[in-house]
Protein backbone atom coordinates (compact mmCIF):
# COMPACT_ATOMS: atom_id res chain seq x y z
CA UNK A 1 0.00 0.00 0.00
CA UNK A 2 1.43 3.37 -0.99
CA UNK A 3 2.20 6.10 1.52
CA UNK A 4 -0.45 8.26 -0.12
CA UNK A 5 -3.13 5.59 0.37
CA UNK A 6 -2.07 5.16 4.00
CA UNK A 7 -2.37 8.92 4.53
CA UNK A 8 -5.71 8.99 2.71
CA UNK A 9 -7.11 6.17 4.87
CA UNK A 10 -5.87 7.95 7.99
CA UNK A 11 -7.67 11.14 6.93
CA UNK A 12 -10.85 9.14 6.30
CA UNK A 13 -10.56 7.52 9.74
CA UNK A 14 -10.13 10.93 11.37
CA UNK A 15 -13.16 12.33 9.56
CA UNK A 16 -15.26 9.32 10.56
CA UNK A 17 -14.10 9.66 14.17
CA UNK A 18 -15.10 13.33 14.33
CA UNK A 19 -18.46 12.53 12.70
CA UNK A 20 -19.07 9.94 15.42
CA UNK A 21 -18.00 12.31 18.17
CA UNK A 22 -20.38 15.02 16.96
CA UNK A 23 -23.21 12.49 16.72
CA UNK A 24 -22.54 11.40 20.31
CA UNK A 25 -22.25 14.93 21.69
CA UNK A 26 -24.90 17.55 22.10
CA UNK A 27 -24.39 19.35 18.79
CA UNK A 28 -25.41 22.60 20.48
CA UNK A 29 -22.80 22.33 23.23
CA UNK A 30 -19.49 24.18 23.11
CA UNK A 31 -17.65 20.88 22.55
CA UNK A 32 -20.12 19.89 19.83
CA UNK A 33 -19.65 23.22 18.06
CA UNK A 34 -15.86 22.90 18.35
CA UNK A 35 -16.01 19.40 16.85
CA UNK A 36 -18.18 20.70 14.00
CA UNK A 37 -15.52 23.28 13.16
CA UNK A 38 -12.84 20.58 13.37
CA UNK A 39 -14.88 18.48 10.97
CA UNK A 40 -15.24 21.37 8.56
CA UNK A 41 -11.47 21.97 8.52
CA UNK A 42 -10.75 18.24 8.14
CA UNK A 43 -13.15 17.88 5.22
CA UNK A 44 -11.75 20.94 3.46
CA UNK A 45 -8.16 19.73 3.88
CA UNK A 46 -9.01 16.23 2.76
CA UNK A 47 -10.84 17.40 -0.36
CA UNK A 48 -7.89 19.60 -1.26
CA UNK A 49 -5.56 16.64 -0.79
CA UNK A 50 -7.75 14.48 -3.04
CA UNK A 51 -7.88 17.20 -5.69
CA UNK A 52 -4.09 17.54 -5.72
CA UNK A 53 -2.85 13.98 -5.22
CA UNK A 54 -5.56 11.44 -5.87
CA UNK A 55 -7.89 12.46 -8.64
CA UNK A 56 -5.22 13.71 -11.09
CA UNK A 57 -3.71 10.20 -11.13
CA UNK A 58 -7.10 8.62 -11.79
CA UNK A 59 -8.05 11.22 -14.40
CA UNK A 60 -4.84 10.58 -16.28
CA UNK A 61 -5.55 6.83 -16.28
CA UNK A 62 -9.14 7.49 -17.35
CA UNK A 63 -7.89 9.04 -20.59
CA UNK A 64 -7.39 5.49 -21.88
CA UNK A 65 -9.89 3.59 -19.70
CA UNK A 66 -13.53 4.27 -20.51
CA UNK A 67 -14.85 2.29 -17.53
CA UNK A 68 -12.73 4.34 -15.15
CA UNK A 69 -13.74 7.55 -16.93
CA UNK A 70 -17.42 6.68 -16.42
CA UNK A 71 -16.82 5.77 -12.77
CA UNK A 72 -14.98 9.05 -12.14
CA UNK A 73 -17.80 10.99 -13.82
CA UNK A 74 -20.34 9.40 -11.48
CA UNK A 75 -18.15 9.99 -8.43
CA UNK A 76 -17.63 13.63 -9.41
CA UNK A 77 -21.37 14.24 -9.76
CA UNK A 78 -21.97 12.58 -6.39
CA UNK A 79 -19.19 14.61 -4.77
CA UNK A 80 -20.55 17.85 -6.19
CA UNK A 81 -23.90 17.11 -4.53
CA UNK A 82 -22.35 16.12 -1.21
CA UNK A 83 -20.01 19.12 -1.18
CA UNK A 84 -22.85 21.54 -1.95
CA UNK A 85 -25.07 20.11 0.77
CA UNK A 86 -22.21 20.05 3.28
CA UNK A 87 -21.31 23.68 2.54
CA UNK A 88 -24.98 24.64 2.89
CA UNK A 89 -25.10 22.86 6.26
CA UNK A 90 -22.04 24.71 7.56
CA UNK A 91 -23.44 28.05 6.32
CA UNK A 92 -26.65 27.25 8.16
CA UNK A 93 -24.68 26.50 11.34
CA UNK A 94 -22.77 29.78 10.99
CA UNK A 95 -26.00 31.73 10.57
CA UNK A 96 -28.08 29.91 13.19
CA UNK A 97 -26.01 27.50 15.25
CA UNK A 98 -29.03 26.71 17.44
CA UNK A 99 -31.47 25.96 14.61
CA UNK A 100 -33.84 23.16 15.52
CA UNK A 101 -33.17 21.30 12.25
CA UNK A 102 -29.37 21.27 12.73
CA UNK A 103 -29.20 17.79 14.38
CA UNK A 104 -31.32 16.15 11.69
CA UNK A 105 -29.36 17.89 8.93
CA UNK A 106 -26.10 16.77 10.50
CA UNK A 107 -27.26 13.15 10.66
CA UNK A 108 -28.23 13.36 6.99
CA UNK A 109 -24.93 14.79 5.77
CA UNK A 110 -23.03 12.42 8.08
CA UNK A 111 -24.68 9.47 6.36
CA UNK A 112 -23.78 10.93 2.96
CA UNK A 113 -20.14 11.46 3.96
CA UNK A 114 -19.84 7.97 5.46
CA UNK A 115 -21.31 6.42 2.33
CA UNK A 116 -18.96 8.42 0.13
CA UNK A 117 -15.91 7.36 2.14
CA UNK A 118 -17.00 3.71 1.98
CA UNK A 119 -17.42 3.88 -1.81
CA UNK A 120 -14.12 5.69 -2.31
CA UNK A 121 -12.23 3.14 -0.25
CA UNK A 122 -13.89 0.16 -1.88
CA UNK A 123 -13.87 1.35 -5.48
CA UNK A 124 -11.62 4.29 -6.20
CA UNK A 125 -8.83 3.30 -3.84
CA UNK A 126 -8.55 -0.04 -5.61
CA UNK A 127 -8.41 1.72 -8.97
CA UNK A 128 -5.75 4.08 -7.66
CA UNK A 129 -3.65 1.16 -6.40
CA UNK A 130 -3.98 -0.59 -9.78
CA UNK A 131 -2.96 2.53 -11.68
CA UNK A 132 0.00 3.35 -9.45
CA UNK A 133 1.25 -0.25 -9.36
CA UNK A 134 1.58 -0.22 -13.19
CA UNK A 135 4.12 2.59 -13.09
Question: Which residues does each predicted region cover?
Answer:
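Small-residue-biased structural context
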Residues: 1-135
